[in-house]
Amino acid sequence: MSYRVIVDSCGELTPQMKESGIFKTASLSMEVDGFHIPDDETFDQADFLKRVAASEECPKSSCPSPERYMELYKCDVDRVYAVTLSGELSGSYNSALLGEKLYKEEDGEEKIHVFNSRSASVGETLIGRKIQECEEVGMDFEQVVETVEAYIEEQHTYFVLENLDTLRKNGRLTGLKSLVVSALNIKPVMGSTPEGTICQLDKSRGMKKALAKMAEHVAKDAVKPEEKILAIAHCNCPERAEAVRKLILEKVKVKDSFIVDTAGISSMYANDGGIIVVL
């Protein structure tokens, strides 16, 4: 193995990615009522959602330290790639860059590139898989970086949540008009901007209609979908995720698709019942 891919823990690793030995996770952490929860293999989604529901305080998150990234860069490979949450939404990207600087000051010799996903969750997962795909066909380091950066440019992220409280209270919806959603059961269809911030794309009354609207946006925005993998992450709602996949695949043909349950950070922001789609 001559390369490593580091993905911060907002990006869910599929079973195949975990088994490959190529991927390593840079864990973020969460806090609910002073209780510290690492976003790693010990994360218990059911317990976490229960704690959040019982708390009057908004859960908080913190990103991996530069030193943690530096530790992950130290390995017996020639090329290291890191994939982080959008730099507009988290400090993880800047931590990864600073970790690279610290590592190289210690005479680290590996080639390192940090990808700003401008996304989250399965957006990061797909970028990690794209890196692996490029490496497996024999691209050199510079070709991998160029190809994956171009892939990120074409990627779109969408989500519909039961509530936006955690995103709003943690300042991730800055600049958006206040959304009156709960009283009228209005569900906004949210998406990513090219810069990696969050925008509102649409809205509908009720979750079912909002998910259908989201599927329409996915199909409309898709760039060369027959060459792409559709990824869906759900927070404790597998049937809803399958229904969304069916809705999208009725409208657009893709290379492949997969569904994962949200890990810690994605569970924190998506909340119980949330759906995230990336194509």
Question: What do the PLM-derived regions correspond to, one by one?
Answer:
Residues T84, H113-V114:
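A glycine-rich beta-strand to alpha-helix segment
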Residues Y3-R4, C10-K24, L28-S29, L89-S92, ...:
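Mixed-charge interfacial surface used for oligomerization/domain docking
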Residues Y3-C63, R68:
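N-terminal glycine-rich anion-binding loop in soluble enzyme alpha/beta folds
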Residues D33, D107-I112:
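Repeat-mediated protein-protein interaction surfaces in helical alpha-solenoids
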